[in-house]
Amino acid sequence: MKNIQIIVASDSVGETAELVARACISQFNPKQCESEISRYPYIEALENVDEVISVAKDTEAIVVYTLVKPEIRKYMEAKLAEFKIKAVDIMGPLMNILLDQIDEKPYFEPGLVHQLDEAYFKKIDAIEFAVKYDDGKDPKGLFKADIVLLGISRTSKTPLSQYLAHKSYKVMNIPIVPEVTPPDDLFNIDSSKCIALKISEEKLNRIRKERLRQLGLGESARYATEQRIEEELNYFHELVDKIGCPIIDVSDKAIEETANDIISLIEQNNFKN
C-alpha cells in the first residue's frame, strides 16, 4: 500500500489548503493508499519555511501551501525547486491572474477570509437580536444591546434597528408610552448606549393621520390628536431627562441619515469610555 505524506503550509490557519488536500485524497481508493496530512500554520518568517522544507525532504512529503505574502511565497518556491520537492501552490497562480485583471494591489494579509466569515456571522447575530428584542419584547436585551433606541410611536425605531443590525450593531428599541412603565433596567444600564428619537408635533400628527387613513379609520381618533401627541412628547422628555441620554430629531431625516448620526454618537461615547 502506498503511503502519501502531505504537508499543509499556510501563513494563516491552513484550513483552505487542508480542505483541498483532503478533497483530492478522497478521490482515491483508501485500500490502495494511506495518507497523512501535517499542518504547519502561521508561516510568517523564512525560518518557518526552512522548517517545512526540512521535514518535506526527510519524509518525501508533498507540500500544499497557501501563502499570500510575496516574499514568503517566492522563498518557498525557490526552496522547493532547489530540493526538487513536489508541491502545489493553491493561491499563487490565481493571485497572479487577479493582479493582471484588477488595477489595484491586493492587501497581502493572511487570514482575511476568516475575518470576513466572522464579520458575516456577527451581522447575522445582530439581525436576529434586533428581531428578538424589537418593541421592548424582553428587558433582558437591555444589557446585551450595543444600542438602545427610545421613542414614541412612528419614530422609525424598528427600521432603524434593522438598518443598524446590518451594520453589525445589536440594537434593542423601547416604545415610550405614558400608560406603560418602562423596564427598571433602563435606568441601570449605561446611558451612553441609549439614544432617544425625537419628532416634531406637526410631523407626528401628519404621520399618524396618514396611518389612520391606511387603516381605514377616521382622523379624529385620539391617537392622532394634538392633545395626545403633546402628552406623549411631554412624557418622552421627562423620561429621557431621567435617563440622561442624547436626543436625535428624526423629523426630517431619512433612515440612513439618522442611523449615521446614531453611529457617530455611539462611537464618540465608546471613545470617551
UniProtKB/Swiss-Prot annotation:
Superkingdom of the source species: Bacteria
Coiled coil: none
Pfam family, one: Kinase-PPPase
A molecular-function term among this protein's GO annotations: protein serine/threonine kinase activity
Enzyme Commission numbers on file: 2.7.11.32, 2.7.4.27
Disulfide bonds, paired cysteine numbers: none
Catalytic activity field: N(tele)-phospho-L-histidyl/L-threonyl-[pyruvate, phosphate dikinase] + ADP = N(tele)-phospho-L-histidyl/O-phospho-L-threonyl-[pyruvate, phosphate dikinase] + AMP + H(+); N(tele)-phospho-L-histidyl/O-phospho-L-threonyl-[pyruvate, phosphate dikinase] + phosphate + H(+) = N(tele)-phospho-L-histidyl/L-threonyl-[pyruvate, phosphate dikinase] + diphosphate
NCBIfam families listed in its UniProt record: PRK05339.1
Family from the record: Belongs to the pyruvate, phosphate/water dikinase regulatory protein family. PDRP subfamily.
Function: Bifunctional serine/threonine kinase and phosphorylase involved in the regulation of the pyruvate, phosphate dikinase (PPDK) by catalyzing its phosphorylation/dephosphorylation.
Name of the molecule in the record: Putative pyruvate, phosphate dikinase regulatory protein 2
